[in-house]
Amino acid sequence: MTGAPPASGTVISRLDGSPPRSLVEELADLLVDTVHGGASIGFLAPLDRAAAVAWWEERVNAVAAGGLAVWVARDGDRVVGTVGVVFPDKPNSRHRAELVKLMVHRDDRGQGLGRALLATAERAAADVGITLLHLDTETGSPAEGLYDRAGWTRIGTIPDYAADPHGTLRPTSIHYKRVGAAVSA
């Protein structure tokens, strides 16, 4: 992993394609915490830790293949957050990417870590020529407020898009943000 420090001693590093098993397990613990905290990120509660480990193992394979970049925030020896960017493989869409799975441990929210992870992903995407990022997030969620404050543009809402961790169908909001060369043009 390569690192960039946000505020207050937390270090954000890019995940490589062969992390130690202990890191995959810590990332799984973060995923379980995020789901059990009510975030709608594709999983239902209770999320089994083994399923979370398996999901992260798949993400590591995607990182190794080059279709996904992941940044991990650590505070000392604890994993406290993560964010990913999925890169399309089609020739007509290589200018854009999708921001995915922004997670901050419940004990570490409200300290600017989500904003630091988001800024890291935006900057890194722009550095490799991405000019447009997009995402979807549960409408009305704390994450949506973060994206609004960070200058993302909401383009619409899809009703009953995905179930929250408790199985209730919730709407999602679609957002985009121009980055890199598109911002300075």
Annotate the PLM regions.
Residues 105-107, 111:
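Active-site acidic-Proline motif in GNAT/NAT acetyltransferases
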Residues 134-136, 153-171:
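Conserved catalytic-core motifs of GNAT/GCN5-like acyltransferases
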Residues 118, 125-137:
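Conserved GNAT acetyl-CoA-binding A-motif
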